[in-house]
Swiss-Prot record:
GO terms, molecular function: ATP binding; ATP hydrolysis activity; ATP-dependent protein folding chaperone; unfolded protein binding
Keyword Chaperone belongs to the record: yes
Keywords on record: ATP-binding, Chaperone, Nucleotide-binding
Protein known as: Chaperone protein HscA homolog
Lineage: Bacteria, Pseudomonadati, Pseudomonadota, Gammaproteobacteria, Pasteurellales
Length: 617
């Protein structure tokens, strides 16, 4: 006997149109813009084939420059060349002057106490400066992508407060950008490495840039990143490595720079040397009239105190997060200064695991933001194409006997909605448990449990009288909504699930293969379970009838004969012979036919008792 009545399915299928979206790493020193193109995420390059755009704006009376050309003006016109506006955004003037007393700008407070920077174009707020950088990045993106952007994801430090985040949004909106989301920089880096769809656990993001160091401790649970703690050092970065190396070179050469030009030349040499030592064990040096060399070991010794400072901040962040080092499952490296081999080695030793370094640390945040932007704008991410375009595994529901009734079959295109109707199994039943399952097997024990919920408030009726409509709906993002509704009262309950969460492509494939290799055995098990359900139903009905009317209409011999057949079915039901159970159900049905007729007659007699003939006619 069928437990479900399949209603006419309703199905929708709105095709996706690719929209242009980018991820922006709005950095303190440099900014980057990235996008997903032809299913590949990549950083967009400027006219000089550079990915890094200096976060610098230079103002003249009638124009402004952004990026490299603006940075080139810093030495000649520092008061009109705004560098590191990110440090100022969302802060009060008093806070800015306390934190950064040596900035070369002329400040004035706005009406609400925020800093305004005097330039040749008048006073500029950090929001306006950031807006000019974002406008430049937007123009670059629209040139490279040959179209108008539908939205952007902008990254911010995890420690940014509400004012700093809102100011960043305001800067974007000032130039007409549709901000899909502000994304924490460490989260973006983790997304770039695909950690959002992998294992759950604690992730450390070690971000050593040019001027600052940030450490973030994240917990990934059910695809959601939670920031447990942040820390760092705003006066520690790759620039400090350069200054130490420059001082060492000047000491070795016994030459001190005489002016700003020579100082810049020395720092440039130090930077080039640092980069060279990331590739080689030793490199030659030439400064003024001096020639020498430096080994990687010597360089490591120079920067060791600075690296130790960063690890102290890491230990403090772990303590703040109440996390032991052993709990950290992945370490992500961000920032150009993490290219230094000694930094990678020290971080690896500290966390007792090899850090993730396969993605360019300068680009990793922008790449993660681009992946998120592509998802939020409505496009399909590479690693979820199968899971989002079609239902990868059938979605079903548990029925009596531990069976699975498939409601949305595997490979159904999404979005989709389908419904089936249940009925109650027992007299007076007022609640129904809904068990949502995923998989291709026939039995509940062999499928993946997604969720359970209970529909309450079903009006008490005889078994089979109530109708409960269960609707499964999968939207374009792969989110499954299940709703159960009793049709007469409209009382309902529902739940939302992400069926694709926690399953890799390999696991999906294995589940499909398992269903194929076990198809015959599964079908036999299903048929056996179905016969057991039918047997339970028959036994329950006969027992209730015997208890109510058996002694009134049956002789002892007739009563005993039915009990014998019923006991036989109970014993066979415990076995595995499906055919024998099926035959025993028929035997019990045959043995109770006369009893059913006598019960019918008894009911008629009771209905007619005390009534005159003319009342019946």
């Amino acid at each position: 006997m069928a437990l479900l009545q399949i209603a006419e399915p309703g199905q929708t299928a709105a095709p996706h149109q690719l929209r242009l979206a980018v991820g922006i790493d709005l950095g303190t020193t440099n900014s980057l813009v990235a996008s997903v193109r032809s299913r590949q995420v990549q950083v967009l390059l400027d006219d000089k084939e550079s990915a890094l755009i200096p976060s610098v704006v230079h103002y003249t009376e009638t124009s402004k420059m952004v990026g490299v050309t603006a940075f080139e003006q810093a030495s000649y016109d520092p008061q009109n060349t705004i560098i590191s506006a990110k440090r100022l955004i969302g802060r009060s003037l008093m806070d800015v002057q306390t934190r950064y007393p040596n900035l070369p700008y002329q400040f004035q407070a706005s009406e609400n106490g925020l800093p305004l920077i005097h330039t040749r174009q008048g006073y500029k707020s950090p929001i306006e400066v950031s807006a000019d950088i974002l406008s430049h990045l937007n123009h670059l993106a629209e040139q490279r992508l040959a179209g108008e952007l539908s939205g952007v994801v902008i990254t911010v430090p995890a420690y940014f407060d509400d004012a700093q985040r809102q100011s960043t949004k305001d800067a974007a909106r000032l130039v007409g950008l549709n901000v899909l989301r502000l994304l924490n920089e460490p989260t973006a880096a983790a997304i770039a490495y695909g950690l959002d769809s992998g294992q759950e656990g604690v992730i450390a993001v070690y971000d050593l840039g040019g001027g600052t160091f940030d450490i973030s401790i994240l917990r990934l649970s059910k695809g959601v990143f939670e920031v447990l703690a942040t820390g760092g050092d705003t006066a520690l970065g790759g620039d400090d490595f350069d200054h130490l190396l420059a001082d060492w070179i000047a000491t070795q050469a016994a030459v001190q720079p005489k002016n700003a030009t020579e100082q810049r030349q020395l720092l440039t040499l130090a930077t080039q040397t640092k980069i060279a030592l990331s590739q080689a064990d030793e490199t030659p040096l030439h400064f003024a009239n001096w020639t020498g060399n430096i080994t990687q070991a010597q360089f490591n010794q120079l920067i060791q105190p600075l690296v130790k400072r960063s690890l102290v901040a890491c230990r403090r962040a772990l303590k703040d997060a109440s996390v032991d080092i052993e709990e950290v499952c992945q370490v992500v490296m961000v920032g150009g200064s993490t290219r230094v081999p000694f930094v990678r080695e020290a971080v690896g030793e500290f966390f007792a695991k090899k850090p993730l370094t396969s993605i360019d640390p300068d680009k990793v945040v922008a790449l993660g933001a681009a992946i998120q932007a592509d998802i939020l704008v409505g496009n399909k991410p590479d690693n979820e194409m199968l899971l989002l375009d079609v239902v990868p595994l059938s979605l079903g529901i548990e029925t009596m006997g531990g069976l699975v009734e498939k409601i949305i079959p595997r490979n159904t295109t999404i979005p989709v909605a389908r419904a089936q109707e249940f009925t109650t199994a027992k007299d007076g039943q007022t609640a129904m448990s809904v068990h949502v399952l995923q998989g291709e097997r026939e039995l509940v024990d062999d499928c993946r449990s997604l969720a359970r919920f209970t529909l309450r408030g079903i009006p008490p009726m005889v078994a089979g009288a109530a109708t409960i409509r269960v609707t499964y709906q999968v939207d374009a993002d792969g989110l499954l909504s299940v709703t159960a509704m009793e049709k007469s009262t409209k009382v309902q309950a529902s739940i939302q699930i992400k069926p694709s969460y926690g399953l890799t492509d390999e696991e999906v494939t294995q589940m499909i293969k398992s269903s194929m290799s076990n198809a015959k055995a599964d079908m036999e098990a299903r048929q056996l379970a179905e016969q057991r359900v039918e047997a339970d139903r028959a036994i329950e009905m006969v027992m209730a009838a015997l208890q109510k009317d058996g002694k009134a209409v049956l002789s002892v011999a007739e009563f005993n004969a039915i009990e014998v057949e019923m006991q036989k079915l109970i014993e066979l039901k415990a076995g595995t012979d499906r055919i024998a159970i099926q035959q025993s159900i028929k035997d019990l049905d045959l043995a109770t036919q006369a009893f059913a007729a006598k019960r019918m007659n008894l009911s008629i007699q009771k209905a007619l008792a005390g009534k005159a003939v003319d009342e019946i006619i």
